[in-house]
Amino acid sequence: MGPLTIRDVTVEFSLEEWHCLDTAQQNLYRDVMLENYRNLVFLGIAVSKPDLITCLEQGKEPCNMKRHEMVAKPPVMCSHIAEDLCPERDIKYFFQKVILRRYDKCEHENLQLRKGCKSVDECKVCKGGYNGLNQCLITTQSKMYQCDKYVKVFYKFSNSDRHKIRHTEKKTCKCKECGKSFCMLSQLTRHKRIHIRENSHKCEECGKAFNQSSALTRHKMTHTGEKPYKCEECGKAFNRSSHLTQHKVIHTREKPYKCEECGKAFNRSSHITQHKRIHNREKPFKYDECCKAFKWSSALTTLTQHKRIHTGEKPYKCEECGKAFNQSSALTRHKMIHTGEKPFQCEECGKAFNRSSHLTQHKIIHTKEKPYKCEECGKAFNRSSHLTKHKRIHTREKAYKCDEYCKAFNWSSALTTLTQHKIIHTGEKPYKCEECGKAFNRSSYLIRHKIIHTGEKPYKCEECGKAFNQSSHLTQHKIIHTGEKPYKCEECGKAFNRSSHLSQHKIIHTGEKPYKCEECGKPFNRFSYLTVHKRIHAGENPNKYEECGKACNHSSNLTKHNS
């Protein structure tokens, strides 16, 4: 037998045969023929490209189509072979009729190998007629094999051997660029597109290119908004079948992925992969700059984002105000400030939020659920942050400490409070009023101060119409109408409508005089009394009688004089 040629692995159809095939069968023929040709090119056997291959590459009908019918009926099958026929009868018939039509001349009746036989030599049942079959194979220069693992038909040695590689997992095709190996040449060809960035499938809508047609098809759904995969349970739709499959687990509550280490179960394979790293403490994504490591598979993105902390890079810029961010999600959230968009709405009360996390926290108000419980005392909370704060009561932990060693703060929010506290020592007042130049050490103080210039009093009493420039003043005022006195003295039972009034009253019982004059040492139980007393030393008499011009250092003395 001569050397292998393209003719040996070519199967030709008549025009009638070709039009009898459906689209799937025609595509199967194209794929097989093109792959055979690529294999010959890879082995250095094929020199020139036949017209048939050119037509197939261009998606046209095969150019070398025979104009006459070669054979009308398939070979006759042995009785013992018929018992082992696979359910894919149509595909087998297709190959028997078209690919094996030349065997009709053969004296040996059985040209189909018994299921489980890998070659002609192993088929013991048909061994009696082997000489006739062998003669036929030499004449037609073609062989047919059936793999015992999958129902597939192969012609020539190259196809059969190539198929066996898939089962043995032998990877003979290696990428010179990155060293990755593949079983099939076609797989290597597809892989090479990653390196050469061959993006032959381009989106007409946005110009984005892909190296696979299936990827382009999925991408197009982004523009059309098409979601063909719908959940029968709740009606939710998805643009990928895999996403629907993952979603269905929510309804079945199935958790098929179980950790062998601790027995914990998960509904996604990716979740168990992440979980396993807890046991082996694996953190594969590490940053060389600060040695910080990340353990989740998604941390490759997190690592990229983390690097921006060191580089200071902020590639995502707001077109509205110019503010830049180091994460695209942060920019998306920021844009809602300009648009006023609040897409996350509570179904219970209609309140809307610009973040899904805020809506989740809000919903707990309606359910009154308190899922975060203190193991120490049993107290429950509706937020994890509240539980974290509460735990510090038991540990007496004060994580945020002033460097001056004067005060410590135990709340997580105290990081801001600590920053504000430090200003007391530095005397810094970074918040300045543009109207009068007065400076403050807190932004909230400046906001309250500005109301003096504007005269604005946004907090109005619904009872009497009186307005205030601070909400706290309105709250205190409302007590006048209700007559409520919530602050009660434990010593004598006297009640007050302000906590500050109760604090002043308590000094009567203790006899304490905490406010001392630095000039003469005289103590007072109220700060206001000390302020008035200091005027004696300063010689200041701010309270003047208009009739006679006499001045007093205390308003009460002026009142007495007037009477």
Curated annotation (Swiss-Prot):
GO annotation, cellular component aspect: nucleus
Subcellular locations according to the entry: Nucleus
Coiled coil start-end: none
UniProt KW keywords: DNA-binding, Metal-binding, Nucleus, Repeat, Transcription, Transcription regulation, Zinc, Zinc-finger
InterPro entries: C2H2-ZF_domain-containing, KRAB, KRAB_dom_sf, Znf_C2H2_sf, Znf_C2H2_type
Cysteine disulfide links: none
ZnF (C2H2-type) intervals: 173-195, 201-223, 229-251, 257-279, 285-310, 316-338, 344-366, 372-394, 400-425, 431-453, 459-481, 487-509, 515-537
Sequence ranges assigned to domain KRAB in this UniProt record: 4-75
GO biological process, one term: regulation of DNA-templated transcription
GO-annotated molecular function: DNA-binding transcription factor activity, RNA polymerase II-specific; RNA polymerase II cis-regulatory region sequence-specific DNA binding; zinc ion binding
Family affiliation: Belongs to the krueppel C2H2-type zinc-finger protein family.
Function: May be involved in transcriptional regulation.
Name of the featured protein: Zinc finger protein 257
